[in-house]
Amino acid sequence: MTEIPGWLSTEIRTGDAIERLASKLKEMSAEPSRAFFARDAENILQSGAVVLVGSRYGVMGLNCGWCGFPTCAEKTGQAPLAPCAFNTNDLGIAVGSAVSVAADHRADCRVLYSGGVGALALDMLPGCRAALAIPVSATGKSPFFDRKPL
């Protein structure tokens, strides 16, 4: 696992790890609100690699109020398990940068919330509380383009 200074971690998974992640998503798709996880599992199986980007939770000490509390100390005291707004903001920036690099190299990819949930359930990003998955494909046609509707 690569730890980016601050709160972010990344992993690149291939082979059996892709199979495990897809299997976990299929299992999780039994819950009605997560039926789309089964479709996303198929996309993961069509990829050569999955990039995982995760964030640990911790306050940045900026007292910005974006979390709904006036100070970081109040947020930590009253909602210690809630993310600092900057934790998820930084996660989004990192994922945007990763898919941009993939596009620059003409690799097809898609950002999957479901893959991040599955990766967290499998503890693929130890210590992280939020994650997104980016399946990557280098085939003739993008498997992420003509996704079947639910």
Which residues make up each language-model segment?
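Acidic, surface-exposed loops and disordered segments
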Residues: 1-150
